[in-house]
Amino acid sequence: VSAPLPLIVRELGGAGAPLVVLHGLLGSSRNWQSAGVALAERGHRVLAPDLRNHGSSPWGDDCSYAALAADVVAMLDRLALGPVHLVGHSMGGKAAMRLVMDRPDLVARLTVVDIAPRAYSDRVRVEFAAMNALDLSAVKSRKDAEEKLAAQVSEWGMRQFILTNLGQDAEGRWRWTVNREALTNSLPEILGNPLAAGEVWDGPTRFLRGGKSNYIRDEDFATIRAHFPRADVVTLPESGHNPHFEARAGFVEATLA
């Protein structure tokens, strides 16, 4: 694994036992502002890093889950945090699974949000194709960028999510704030299984799934329990893939229960 990168960390407030949130692909700590504050109000010190190649954190070519986890381990060591309640959504959930296998001493409790320890085939490729096809030099405004994305990304909410990664440099030129090239090249790895057969963490574990999402299927339960024998699976029926947005109150309850 490449040397760990120093992650930018957003402190979302609170005092008490530390709870660390790992965001998903094309996300950042900003996505967790509201849910993080809600968790902090329940008596936790909540921290959310920008993972490598995302948000304001440094870029690196290695997007393996071992590398993502090692960055977070270095952050926990630097801040003298641990054992923590580790919460990971989607890609961040896979990074969290990898971390508990590599450094079980740093995690008191694991919450994995709407992702299973397996490979996924078809996800997000359309979004990356749309980002890669967008000629930033021809973009006149954020609205213009959204209209250009609409040709490939039909869902308004997904276009808005992609556009959270579009910024302007000092000269006012549009640029991606994510390392689009490294993430595109690493999609097979990001979509892959973060765990190897036989890896087990027997700490307290909860998998949260959105009732309207198909990321965690009933047939994934056996695989989940093979790696995490103490895991339970809680479904938030009103939510899709992003329960921290779509069902925040239920998400906070299920995360802390």
Question: Each PLM stretch: what is its role?
Answer:
Residues 67-84:
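Conserved acidic catalytic loop of the alpha/beta-hydrolase fold
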Residues 8-58, 206:
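Conserved HGGG/HGGXW glycine-rich cap/lid loop of the alpha/beta-hydrolase fold
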Residues 236-252:
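Catalytic histidine-centered segment of alpha/beta-hydrolase-like enzymes
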Residues 1-20, 41-44, 81-83, 171, ...:
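Alpha/beta-hydrolase fold catalytic core
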Residues 170-227, 232-235:
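Conserved serine/cysteine hydrolase catalytic core
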Residues 122, 137-192:
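Conserved alpha/beta-hydrolase catalytic His-Asp/Glu region
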Residues 97-102, 106-141:
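Flexible "cap/lid" loop of the alpha/beta hydrolase fold
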Residues 88-92, 96:
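Gly/Ala-rich beta-loop-alpha elbow adjacent to hydrolase catalytic centers
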